[in-house]
C-alpha cells in the first residue's frame, strides 16, 4: 500500500538556484545521504529526463530509474519499473518564492516491498523527506 508524505523547508536562495542544485542529479552522491551513484540515462531540454540511481542505506541497497517532468517552479518524478525494494514511487519538489528565499515542498508517495508496520513506514518516509530537505538546504546555501 502506497503512503504519501510531505514536508516544507525555506532555503535562503532564489528558486532558480535551488532548482539548479536539484537539476544537477549527477552530483547527488556528493551531498545526498544514501545515494552512491546517479547516471543520466536520457538528457532532457530542461533537465535530465531519465536517471538511474544506486542507493545503499541502513543495510538496504537498490537500483532504480526515475523519469522527470521539469517545470519552472519545480520537478515531478516517477519510478519507471518496480525494483528490489520499491513497487512504485512518485514525488515532486515544488518551489515557491518566499520573503527569506524559497519555500521548498517535497512530496513523496512510495509503495515498498519490505514489510513494515504502517506507523514505522510513515515514520521512515517522513525521515527520508526531512533528511532530503535538510541536505538540499545545506547544499544550496553552501554554494552561495
Question: What name fits each language-model region?
Answer:
Residues 18-22, 28, 51, 77, ...:
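Hydrophobic pocket/interface hotspot
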Residues 109-144:
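A conserved amphipathic terminal alpha-helix motif
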Residues 1-46, 135:
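Hydrophobic ligand-binding cavity/cleft-lining segments
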Residues 29-30, 40-44, 54-101, 109-111, ...:
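Hydrophobic-ligand binding "helix-grip"
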Residues 5-9, 93, 106-108:
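A structural signal for short, well-ordered beta-strand segments
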Residues 37-41, 50, 124-126, 141:
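Juxtamembrane/interface motifs at transmembrane-helix termini
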Residues 23, 90, 119-120:
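Generic recognition of short, well-ordered alpha-helical segments
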Amino acid at each position: 500500500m502506497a503512503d504519501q508524505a510531505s514536508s516544507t523547508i525555506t532555503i535562503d536562495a532564489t528558486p532558480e538556484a535551488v532548482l539548479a542544485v536539484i537539476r544537477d542529479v549527477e552530483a547527488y552522491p556528493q551531498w545526498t545521504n544514501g545515494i552512491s551513484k546517479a547516471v543520466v540515462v536520457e538528457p532532457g531540454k530542461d533537465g535530465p529526463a531519465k536517471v538511474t540511481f544506486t542507493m545503499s542505506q541502513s543495510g538496504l541497497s537498490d537500483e532504480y530509474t526515475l523519469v522527470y517532468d521539469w517545470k519552472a517552479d519545480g520537478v515531478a518524478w516517477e519510478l519507471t519499473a518496480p525494483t528490489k525494494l520499491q513497487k512504485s514511487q512518485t514525488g515532486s519538489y515544488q518551489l515557491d518564492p518566499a520573503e527569506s528565499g524559497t519555500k521548498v515542498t517535497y512530496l513523496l508517495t512510495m509503495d515498498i516491498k519490505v514489510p513494515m508496520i504502517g506507523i514505522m513506514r510513515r515514520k521512515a518516509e517522513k525521515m527520508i523527506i526531512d533528511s532530503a530537505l535538510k541536505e538540499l538546504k545545506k547544499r544550496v546555501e553552501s554554494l552561495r
